[in-house]
């Protein structure tokens, strides 16, 4: 049985960030590093949460929620004007990033949607965010458009 939840231990964070590293490296989005972790400056901030989908003790999917704060959000590097417009309207927002899934999982789409739903509900009802952004690599845009509309 797969369970989706907020990562609550350092071990879960490490497993999640290792999965992000593995998936990003396999798809050519990230080069090798000796720690085999994909850690961004945002992961070091208290305004960031990591979510995991686990089967037994194995992390099979992960997503990171970055709330707008000290460093802004990751998408701001590409979409400065759009993010600045939202901020000027006093919108409270965040970004889902590092959304990955281990390949070959049964019910991949359902797992993906369950994890995404959890992160969005947490953002809305626990963190009281008005909006949540999800920036996608160009080769994944058609998937997100098909699945999320």
Each PLM stretch: what is its role?
Residues 1-42, 50-52, 59-60:
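Short amphipathic alpha-helix that is part of the acyltransferase structural core
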Residues 52-86:
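Short, His- and charge-rich active-site/binding loops that engage polyanionic ligands
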């Amino acid at each position: 049985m797969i369970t989706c939840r907020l990562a609550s231990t350092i071990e879960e964070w490490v497993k999640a960030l290792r999965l992000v590293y593995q998936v990003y490296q396999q798809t050519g989005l990230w080069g090798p590093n000796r720690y085999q972790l994909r850690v961004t400056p945002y992961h070091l901030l208290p305004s960031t949460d990591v979510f995991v989908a686990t089967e037994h003790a194995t992390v099979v999917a992960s997503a990171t929620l970055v709330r707008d704060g000290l460093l802004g959000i990751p998408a701001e590097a590409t979409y400065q004007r759009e993010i600045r417009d939202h901020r000027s309207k006093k919108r409270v927002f965040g970004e889902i990033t590092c959304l990955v899934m281990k390949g070959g999982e049964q019910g991949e789409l359902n797992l993906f949607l369950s994890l995404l739903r959890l992160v969005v509900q947490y953002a809305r009802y626990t963190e009281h965010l008005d909006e949540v952004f999800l920036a996608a690599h160009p080769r994944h845009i058609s998937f997100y458009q098909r699945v999320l509309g």
